[in-house]
């Protein structure tokens, strides 16, 4: 079996590339996916988001090694093992990232990936419902909407931010990210709008696109050229050959793992596992980054939260309405207001993100509070801690060793202390007076630096945004894995295009920029002239040097 292009992974970037590489009919594409079909309400119902990320059926089941700086806790790292990859198990929050994120990419060696370069690709991919005119795309495959439940707590959160002196923004994906405002969702007609729904399923209707179910074991190389992929399907091993190129889009965990199993990575590490060296790229698996967050929870004095809808009868009613009409509380992820703010004067653009939720519960659906409540998920966006993904053995079936080194930099602790205190300030504003009860978490007894640090150590959680393990950079950067056209340095016919190539993590959730990577990489792969650069200038707070708001 062979095709012009072989893509490993049907996730956010992989699905976008399958769509774009095949759209003019000139080239054939095979997408290799080990996961299951994305069928059923547990995947497609937005409100059921906590289920697929906790199910072996849909998730690779990765966890970090015990993390020494957070009390030896091992945090889960869900990655989608399903059509659509992690876009089929994520929280459906849509964030492009800040313009300065991409300018930093370009300045660090990923030339051609500045905000002016990537904005046209965000516009090409979007079908934005209600975003800022002129800044958003309206004809792309990816539907993006605002929340529709209109809970008064969403408005209270935005108003509280305003009362605290922060900016308000009507579209954080437009000209102005900074501020409090409505959150955007990848939901369409009441259904999760994953990369599979947006890109892959339309592409699979074309005669030149084929989906192959199989477990990718390694890249097949002839000398220093990639010519195919060895896959395992059942008990059968076979090679899918690529006439032009192999493209890895297997996630920030599996992409570096696959490179190393194929002899591309740190020479000493590969030798340790008896793997023949093809290209010594010390950056493979390094530079691992993530977003962490804590949940600040308050009791609510009015019965307007989702607590009353957590019982079996209400869940059944919500499920029936969604199954019949794709409306109601089942048709949203319930993240409908958000904020991006700066932590202090001298910070040029937001470095803290908020998700607001009208219930007190864990993100994975476990440990709901036993009363009406609401919460903010809050965390710093630019942690200085860095980790790694390495091989446990040369057996492709073994999970890799994942070490995030969470909270290993002292600045991360100071940033989180500020997040806790800032959230208390916001929840203390007059807008919440009609609703605010006692603090559930951390609790009124947690006040000093040491007490807050202990709370963070015990309760900090991953936002599930791993990235950076196949860093994109200049060819002469010894830690770069791919060049600015996503080509693996030192190997021909092989590219990586997914969140693993991010030089530095972006502001916000990663599904949006991962799809953008797939869109832009497609033009590089096809040898097309990139879309014309934008001349639009993003808003930067004129007070950034003297104030945090």
UniProtKB/Swiss-Prot annotation:
Catalysis: reaction(s): choline + A = betaine aldehyde + AH2; betaine aldehyde + NAD(+) + H2O = glycine betaine + NADH + 2 H(+)
Pfam families membership: GMC_oxred_C, GMC_oxred_N
Pathway: Amine and polyamine biosynthesis; betaine biosynthesis via choline pathway; betaine aldehyde from choline (cytochrome c reductase route): step 1/1
Gene Ontology molecular functions: betaine-aldehyde dehydrogenase (NAD+) activity; choline dehydrogenase activity; flavin adenine dinucleotide binding
Any one Gene Ontology BP term: glycine betaine biosynthetic process from choline
Signal peptide: none
EC annotation from Swiss-Prot or TrEMBL: 1.1.99.1, 1.2.1.8
Cofactor: FAD
PROSITE patterns for the chain: GMC_OXRED_1, GMC_OXRED_2
Protein keywords: FAD, Flavoprotein, NAD, Oxidoreductase
Coiled-coil region list: none
Function: Involved in the biosynthesis of the osmoprotectant glycine betaine. Catalyzes the oxidation of choline to betaine aldehyde and betaine aldehyde to glycine betaine at the same rate.
Family under the similarity heading: Belongs to the GMC oxidoreductase family.
Protein name per the record: Oxygen-dependent choline dehydrogenase
Lineage summary: Bacteria, Pseudomonadati, Pseudomonadota, Alphaproteobacteria, Hyphomicrobiales
């Amino acid at each position: 079996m062979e095709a012009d292009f072989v893509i490993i992974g049907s996730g956010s970037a992989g699905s976008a590339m399958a769509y774009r590489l095949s759209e003019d009919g000139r080239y054939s594409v095979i997408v290799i996916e080990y996961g299951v079909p994305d069928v059923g309400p547990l995947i497609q119902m937005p409100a059921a988001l906590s289920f697929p990320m906790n199910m072996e059926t849909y998730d690779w089941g990765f966890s970090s090694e015990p993390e020494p700086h957070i009390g030896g806790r091992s945090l889960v790292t869900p990655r989608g093992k399903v059509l659509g990859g992690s876009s089929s198990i994520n929280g459906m929050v849509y964030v492009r990232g800040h313009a300065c994120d991409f300018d930093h990419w370009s300045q660090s060696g990923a030339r051609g990936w500045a905000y002016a370069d990537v904005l046209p690709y965000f516009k090409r991919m979007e079908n934005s419902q209600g975003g800022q005119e002129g800044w958003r795309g309206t004809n792309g495959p990816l539907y993006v909407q605002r929340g529709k439940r209109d809970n008064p707590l969403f408005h209270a959160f935005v108003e509280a931010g305003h009362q605290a002196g922060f900016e308000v923004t009507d579209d954080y994906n437009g000209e102005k990210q900074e501020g409090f405002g409505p959150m955007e969702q990848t939901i369409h007609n009441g259904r999760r709008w994953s990369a599979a729904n947006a890109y892959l399923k339309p592409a699979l209707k074309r005669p030149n696109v084929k989906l192959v179910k199989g477990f990718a074991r390694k890249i097949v190389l002839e000398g220093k050229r990639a010519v195919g992929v060895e896959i395992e399907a059942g008990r059968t091993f076979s090679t899918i050959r690529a006439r032009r190129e192999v493209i890895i889009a297997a996630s920030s965990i599996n992409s570096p793992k696959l490179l190393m199993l194929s002899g591309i990575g740190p020479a000493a590490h590969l030798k340790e596992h008896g793997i023949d060296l093809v290209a010594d790229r010390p950056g493979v698996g390094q530079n691992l980054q993530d977003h962490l967050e804590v949940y600040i929870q308050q009791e609510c004095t009015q019965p307007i939260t989702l607590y009353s809808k957590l019982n079996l009868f209400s869940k059944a009613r919500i499920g029936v309405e969604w199954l019949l009409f794709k409306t109601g509380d089942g048709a949203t992820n319930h993240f409908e207001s958000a904020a991006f703010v700066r932590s202090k004067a001298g910070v040029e653009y937001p470095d803290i993100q908020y998700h607001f939720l009208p219930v007190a519960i864990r993100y994975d659906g476990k440990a709901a509070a036993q009363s009406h409540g609401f919460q903010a998920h809050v965390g710093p966006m630019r942690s200085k801690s860095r980790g790694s993904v390495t091989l446990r053995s040369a057996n492709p079936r073994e999970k890799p060793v994942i070490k995030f080194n969470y909270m290993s930099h002292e600045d991360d602790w100071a940033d989180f202390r500020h997040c806790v205190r800032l959230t208390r300030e916001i929840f203390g504003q007059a807008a919440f007076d009609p609703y605010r009860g006692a603090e559930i978490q951390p609790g009124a007894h947690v006040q000093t630096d040491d007490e807050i640090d202990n709370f963070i150590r015990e309760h900090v959680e991953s936002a599930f945004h791993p990235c950076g393990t196949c860093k994109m950079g200049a060819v002469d950067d010894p830690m770069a894995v791919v060049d600015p056209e996503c080509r693996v340095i030192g190997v021909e016919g092989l590219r990586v295009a997914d969140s693993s190539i991010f030089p530095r993590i972006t502001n916000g959730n990663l599904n949006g920029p991962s799809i953008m990577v797939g869109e832009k990489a497609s033009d590089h792969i096809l040898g097309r002239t990139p879309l014309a650069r934008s001349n639009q200038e993003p808003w930067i707070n004129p007070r950034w040097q003297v104030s945090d708001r």
